[in-house]
């Protein structure tokens, strides 16, 4: 199964607070440099990389001289504000030594639950990755309240993995992986090398609370792996202090715990598209577009659309029908109903002239289409 790791071409790497701050002693720039060197090696090997970095609150606590994590919301937000500055600067300077650009991206769960903002975030991240820039993502703790109190960056990392359709989510933690018993209390505890993410037996061994610096314990990492698995992604939970951990994972070494999905990414995404969104409108296709979509498995271009019905926004679900009204497919549109009306029947190179901008050459991308 480790071929799922060695063959992964798009990685999301999440690094926790305890690792980044040397268990609360401030940002561990030496450790960050070691991880950066390994991530640069991934980049040079042609692997697309997104980094989800915890540590803003913990770094802020260190800068402010606070020994214990505060419970008051305004103090947590203040610590996040102070810490985020140093955190981003540290990543930027470390990657710059190797000639790589970074980009700060602050997200909330709301950004990924609103479909329009979800698509905007996805477009931005894809563009950054295509440009060879390493996005450094953190939750926007400064302005979000519930996420500080209840959220965790393990969940955010899984959402980001789904957002960018990553092949692999790597969660670096202060433990070597998931064990069949708590290794702190049981010296005979054995590392679980591989398991299905949805295996109910994992719940019994994922107990335990989060550390004093962060918000996510092993239970949140298991939930994150299950969230990634819903879209067909694989997750490795592994010790961040293991020497050359990312290099060795890429080489196929059995480090940490590999949690696998029960179906392929394509099948998982298609199932989600088919069953989890309400239809907001209808696109009537000409015969050529019907063939392109249903037989050739191509994207739906504006030139093949004869009519637009209903009211929908970018990112919402529409039904695609032939001229006889038979449903052919359904998918997520790149343009609103009003915009679609303006570009229907037109070639792709006319979109910018008609709208003044281009959100994509397709009305519905083939990755966002499911045949019915």
Swiss-Prot record:
User: What are its E.C. numbers?
Assistant: 2.7.2.11
| Keywords per UniProt | Amino-acid biosynthesis, ATP-binding, Cytoplasm, Kinase, Nucleotide-binding, Proline biosynthesis, Transferase
| Pathways involved | Amino-acid biosynthesis; L-proline biosynthesis; L-glutamate 5-semialdehyde from L-glutamate: step 1/2
PROSITE patterns (alphabetical): GLUTAMATE_5_KINASE, PUA
Which residues are listed for substrate binding in this entry?
54, 141, 153
| Compartmental location | Cytoplasm
Single GO molecular function:
ATP binding
Q: Which reaction does it catalyse?
A: L-glutamate + ATP = L-glutamyl 5-phosphate + ADP
Top enzyme class, one word, equals transferase
Binding-site residues, ATP: 14, 173-174
Q: Give the GO biological process terms.
A: L-proline biosynthetic process; proline biosynthetic process
List cellular component terms (GO). Answer: cytosol
Outline the extent of the PUA domain: 280-358
Q: What's this protein's family per the entry?
A: Belongs to the glutamate 5-kinase family.
What exactly does this protein do? Catalyzes the transfer of a phosphate group to glutamate to form L-glutamate 5-phosphate.
Q: Fetch the NCBIfam families from UniProt.
A: proB (TIGR01027)
User: Which HAMAP family does this chain map to?
Assistant: ProB
- Protein name per its UniProtKB record: Glutamate 5-kinase
- Name the gene behind this protein: proB
